[in-house]
Amino acid sequence: MEAKKLQKFSEYSMGTYLLCPKKYRYIYIEKLFKKQKRKVNEYFIFGNIIHLTCKEFYQKRAEDRSIENLYNIFRESWKRSGIRAFFKSREEEKELGEKGLYMLSNFYNSFGQKVPYLTEHYMENIFKDYIFFGRVDRIDLSADGTLQIVDYKTNKYYDVGEDNEERARKTMQLKFYAYLLNSLKSNVTSASYYYFAEDKFDTVEFNQESANYL
């Protein structure tokens, strides 16, 4: 007897399903349309550079985790990334490069020497006939043993208010990650987007009730 193939949901495909179940069916089940690929441009590569820089920073020894070394990792990642091919002038490259250094100075001031419990952590679990999976940028461990999820954002922060449908959509990714991690016998008490440019945390407190939107 052939084993039943379980349907897989990432936070992105889950978002598609919640926004429009028909669209989800056409793309992921009937495969009538190709999944939309992200457009590769300087901003997409820039976001990857920032994420990679933060990850590599914590692979350094504690005594080497200075802001100067953080900047150096960024510059080396920039050179290797191929991002220069997307700029029309050196001035454009300089402007975005300086923005990156500013973002990383915010990051250093907010996180500094605080070593994350996990970075780029992949997780998946089975829920009845479904598999949920995702990858978290950062997980911090509190003294009481609880976990805080942090998802890095290089885009601009925008306020959508509280207790409305748009807020629920915006924070669905955080709730998805927290719900999935808690299902793996962890205790997540909060999940945050960290916006580099504004040095701002957008946080939701997590409990089982918070997962009802899923």
Annotate each predicted stretch with a short phrase.
Residues 18-29, 49, 65-83, 183-196:
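Short, compositionally biased low-complexity segments
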Residues 4-5, 33:
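An N-terminal structural lobe/cap that precedes and organizes the functional/catalytic core
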Residues 8-23, 133-145:
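An acidic intrinsically disordered interaction segment
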Residues 121-214:
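Mg2+/Mn2+-dependent nuclease catalytic core
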Residues 14-33, 37-62, 97, 116, ...:
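Nuclease catalytic cores
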Residues 20, 50-51, 100, 138, ...:
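A residue-level signal for conserved active-site and pocket-lining positions in enzyme catalytic cores
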Residues 53-120:
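A non-catalytic, helix-rich entry segment at domain boundaries
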Residues 9, 45-49, 95, 99, ...:
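Generic recognition of stable, solvent-exposed alpha-helical segments in well-folded globular domains
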